[in-house]
UniProtKB/Swiss-Prot annotation:
Origin species: Thermofilum pendens (strain DSM 2475 / Hrk 5)
Alphabetical keyword list: Ribonucleoprotein, Ribosomal protein
Entry's Gene Ontology molecular function annotations: RNA binding; structural constituent of ribosome
Annotated protein name in UniProt: Large ribosomal subunit protein eL14
InterPro entries referenced in this protein's UniProt entry, alphabetically: KOW, Rib_uL2_dom2, Ribosomal_eL14, Ribosomal_eL14_arc, Ribosomal_eL14_KOW, Translation_prot_SH3-like_sf
Similarity comment text for this entry: Belongs to the eukaryotic ribosomal protein eL14 family.
Any one of the GO BP annotations: ribosomal large subunit biogenesis
Cited CDD domains: KOW_RPL14 (cd06088)
Length: 98
């Protein structure tokens, strides 16, 4: 089991979207993944993100690789995580990269 796999819910730890939750939609390579909020739910636009700037959470939803924002939103509603995704959290900075 990988930590950063499709459907994993994460918190962005850096940038203007720091503290917002997102869902991994696709794995680009060893260092980058494609994430989305979707924007209508948590405010995170679909974009490439470095895995060093993500903090994985224990939640995972069942979506296919490359799922659209509508499919991600439907999966979040099915799992009952819409309100959870709207909450902003204070990201913790890992000491391994400082």
């Amino acid at each position: 089991m990988k930590v950063y796999d499709v459907g994993r819910i994460c918190v962005k730890t850096s940038g203007r979207e720091a503290g917002l939750k997102c869902v991994i939609v696709d794995i680009i390579d060893d260092n980058f993944v494609l994430v989305t909020g979707p924007k209508s739910v948590s405010g995170v636009k679909r974009r490439r993100a470095n895995i060093r700037h993500l903090e994985p959470l224990e939640y995972k939803i069942s979506i296919s690789k490359g799922a659209s924002d509508e499919e991600v939103k439907a999966a979040l509603e099915k799992a009952g995580l819409i309100e959870f995704m709207k909450e902003k959290v204070k990201p913790t900075v890992s000491t391994t990269f400082v």
